[in-house]
Amino acid sequence: LEELEKNDVIYAARKFNEAELLYPQSVWAPRAALMAAYAYFSQLYYDDTIVELEKFLQKYKNHPRRDYAYYLLALSHYNLIIDETKDLEEILKAKQYFKIIIKNYPNTEFAIDSEFKLELIQEILASKEMYLARYYVDREKWIPAINRFKTVINDYETTIYVEEALHRLVELHYKLGLVDESKKYASLLGYNYQS
């Protein structure tokens, strides 16, 4: 702990790992494994944190602090989200682990923050769909654009992107001569957003 307090994270994590290896049957072994993960997390070494936590979760299946391990794991993936327009891997992993927390540990302090983070992830995923839809519109690929806008409406209905997606669906259907479809989306737009 002394090394951790001095911000010598790598050395502290190694010492925690060493303690786990030297005393595998003690109550300190899983605690040391969690502390190694926390040491990395505290200094933003998220990849190392993920490795430590995955080992912990695999090894200590009945540990009472698995909720904390899942939470740190989810946060580590969440903090690795750099550009949602390119790579969804970290977003989807974060979403997966936040859902595990909400499902398996609903009465913990971590569940509330996990729900909030899931809402933010939904916004990120919806923005990805909108980015792709606009990409198709710019290239006059109407059908793929329509499909992406529909995905926003169907899968991300609580996000801020629904209004724009409906607006674009009205435009695209009208442009394609599908007036009835255009009117359907226009009525949804008017009813829900008074647009």
PLM segments and residue spans:
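Acidic, polar-rich low-complexity tracts and alpha-helical solenoid repeat scaffolds
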Residues: L1-S195
